[in-house]
Amino acid sequence: MNKKILSAIFAFAVCMSSCNYLDYNESSGFDKEDMFTYFERAKGMLTTVYSYLPADFGNFDGATRAAATDEAEYAWNTSGIIRYNNGSWSPILTIDNVWGTYYTAIRSANMFLNNYQEDFTNIEWNDNYETLMQQYQYYPYEARFLRAFYYFELAKRYKNVPLITECLELDEANSVAPSDFDKVIDFIVSECDEIMDKLPVSYKDVPGYETGRITQGAVMALKSRTLLYAASPLYAGTAGQEKWIAAAKAAKQLIDKVESDGRYQLVDEQIWNNLASKELILETRRGNSNDFEKLNFPIGYEGGNSGTCPTQNLVDAFEMKDGSRFDWGNQEHIDNMYNPEKRDPRLFKTVLTNGSTFKNAAVETFVGGKNGAPLDGATPTGYYLKKYVVETISLNPNNTTTDRHVWILFRYAEVLLNYTEALGLW
């Protein structure tokens, strides 16, 4: 036990110390004063804070987080994700290092906020000065959102966590005690309330228009998610009614805003990798690559490696098209298990089933099929992943292509579901 405590303290200290320096590659050689004297360097610092936003594109030793649950199974037993299946993981033996990653992100946010200055006199005579300052006015509020988001990610995993808003030296970091869960939640909600009206609904009218930045909608969505989790019996015990009310009101706040300005809406089309989707509130953007496809194209397709394979549990969770639950005791359901005319259409946007068309060829997951056992690395579940996979990417060595990848952090559908859940448990 003492060894575990010391290991956790050491990890925290490493993350929270050395705030006089900046882990930003493009700024190597610059000290703190240099960093916050020039606009582009300060912008780079905020970009660094953004860079810690999560994206589950095979981050877990090639697998997605779903492979740690009953939603999926990883095709290769060499991945560290197996720790979650065989019970060998622990708070200090994980494969994603959330603690270290997010406290590093929080340290970067604290550094930005503690050293933020409202003006850059060295560029005030530049032609684009006003444009830059109109962008810059939102930076501290974006940093505060990001810090609150990272605290939510920590609190939902560890519950009581150290709440730090200043840069600490090593000896100070060693003496920080965890804050009560409710205090962390109150901090996140308070930050959301304070910055909500400071951020724009959209950046379209901001000079130097940039997408992917924090908006009012993202702040409201974080508040909604935070209060919903806080109301859960896992955290609230039996004292949840007032918390469910707060969660419902937070979700309704965003719903009312959407009804007034139409900023977001539910859509039928695919929303991942679709930056134009009206359902997107906030997403993590990754540059052009084909790494996710190399991991998850089915075995039997050029360059395929199977990767994260959805389970029957996940497939069964998709309803029939008439809204009824899939029932193995209902022969009609069994006969129409993979019938797009009878099954929830979201199933076929998420999972490649036997007989699905992928890259203009039928998927064969049955034993002896071109994508099934006994091929080495064939799906262990009978299914392959379709969601987030960019089918048009080519892994042909003579004609390899890439594409952008977008991981959804908040979508409008979640807010509606948050509201429904909170009302149902109010």
PLM features: residue spans?
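C-terminal substrate/ligand-recognition segments
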Residues: 96, 345-426
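Bacterial Sec-dependent N-terminal signal peptides
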Residues: 1-28
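Short edge-strand/loop segments of extracellular domains
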Residues: 167-171, 252
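An aromatic- and glycine-enriched ligand-binding surface/loop that stacks and positions planar moieties
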Residues: 20-82, 159-161, 185, 192-196, ...
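Conserved, well-structured interaction surfaces
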Residues: 38-47, 51-55, 76-158, 173-186, ...
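Core alpha/beta catalytic barrel or barrel-like domain that forms the active/cofactor pocket
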Residues: 161-167
